[in-house]
Amino acid sequence: MTHTHDHEHDHNHEPDYITLVEENGNESLFQILITIDGQEEFGKNYVVLQPTEFEEDEQGLIDVLAYSFTENADGTEGDLQPIPEDAEDEWDMIEEVFNSFMDEQED
């Protein structure tokens, strides 16, 4: 089955960063790899993050995180929400846009 999604995503050339604070107070710095405008299809925006301190696995892969987000009025901060595991259409769209983004980065 093939899906075609026409979603806008931000191609910042200078990296943006975000600090995530865990429940225990630990802070971790993440690079924002891509933001995805999913407003039309899902009524949400999405962000894909990569830890700034990471280790590749045996296959050279790095874990990334994806969240939906709501920006505050001035666009400088916002709230991240986990994407439900059973939201298959959302995950499919995020994966497709992210894979396209990564393919463009390799070119």
From Swiss-Prot:
It holds the Pfam family DUF1292. PANTHER family: UPF0473 PROTEIN CBO2561/CLC_2432, UPF0473 PROTEIN CBO2561_CLC_2432. NCBIfam families: PRK13678.1-2 (NF010215). Belongs to the UPF0473 family. This is UPF0473 protein LACR_0139.
